[in-house]
From Swiss-Prot:
Location, primary (coarse class): plastid
Organism, as annotated: Euglena longa
GO CC list: plastid
Compartments, as annotated in UniProt: Plastid
Protein name (Swiss-Prot/TrEMBL): Uncharacterized 9.2 kDa protein in rpl23-rpl2 intergenic region
Keywords, ordered alphabetically: Plastid
Length: 76
C-alpha cells in the first residue's frame, strides 16, 4: 500500500463517519422533539406539576435516544 491508497481509505472513512454522525444528530433532534411534544401533551392533559412526572419524561427521553442509537448502530 502506498500513500495514495491510505489517503483514499482515510477519505472514505471520513465520509462514512460524517454520514453516521449526521444520522445520529437527526435522530437525537427528532427524539428531543418527540419528548417535548409528550411533555407538552402531558402538561395539557394531566396537568403535570409534580417533580416526579418531569423526571419520568427526562428518563423516557434518555432511554428512547439510547434505543434509537442502538438501532442506528446495528443498521450501520
Amino acid at each position: 500500500m502506498n500513500r495514495k491508497d491510505i489517503k483514499d481509505i482515510l477519505i472514505k472513512l471520513l465520509v462514512i463517519h460524517a454520514c453516521v454522525t449526521f444520522v445520529f444528530a437527526i435522530t437525537f433532534l427528532m427524539c428531543n422533539v418527540e419528548a417535548a411534544i409528550i411533555l407538552k401533551s402531558l402538561s395539557i392533559f394531566t396537568k403535570c406539576k409534580y417533580f416526579y412526572d418531569n423526571i419520568y419524561i427526562i428518563f423516557y427521553n434518555i432511554f428512547y435516544c439510547i434505543k434509537l442509537y442502538f438501532i442506528n448502530f446495528f443498521v450501520f
